[in-house]
Amino acid sequence: MSFFHRLSAVVVIASLATACASAPPRPVRSEFEDIPVPKGLTYEADRSTIIESPQVKAARLVYRGRIEIESLAAAMRTTLEGNGWRNVSSTTTARHGTTQVYEKAGNSLQVLLWEGLWYTYVELTASRASQLSR
């Protein structure tokens, strides 16, 4: 690996390691713009799925980053509630991490947060009914 590739890798890792969970959020996907994702998380396209039909849109969106899980869970709750989502329940276990469940105008959202060996993962599972034109 060349010096510049190593240097680039170090810069990327350092920026991810110093990312703050309370940084301004960015939208997840255009279909789910009211579900913010804190900066410092990278979208994992190969682990994610988006399903669209005439009646429903659903998604399983996976992100990862190097953010402390407790501050990430708090940031997720704060930003989601700021976007009108109502927290229905929240559970934390040592084995399975944190699960947060939200609802908003008949739409549902489940947030799973867990720690892997190197990264903290966030899985957003959302569904919403499509507005049918008449």
What are the language-model segments listed below?
Residues 17-19:
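C-terminal motif of bacterial Sec signal peptides marking the signal peptidase cleavage site
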Residues 6-13:
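Sec-dependent N-terminal signal peptides
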Residues 2-6, 21-134:
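An acidic-aromatic pocket/loop used at catalytic or ligand-binding sites
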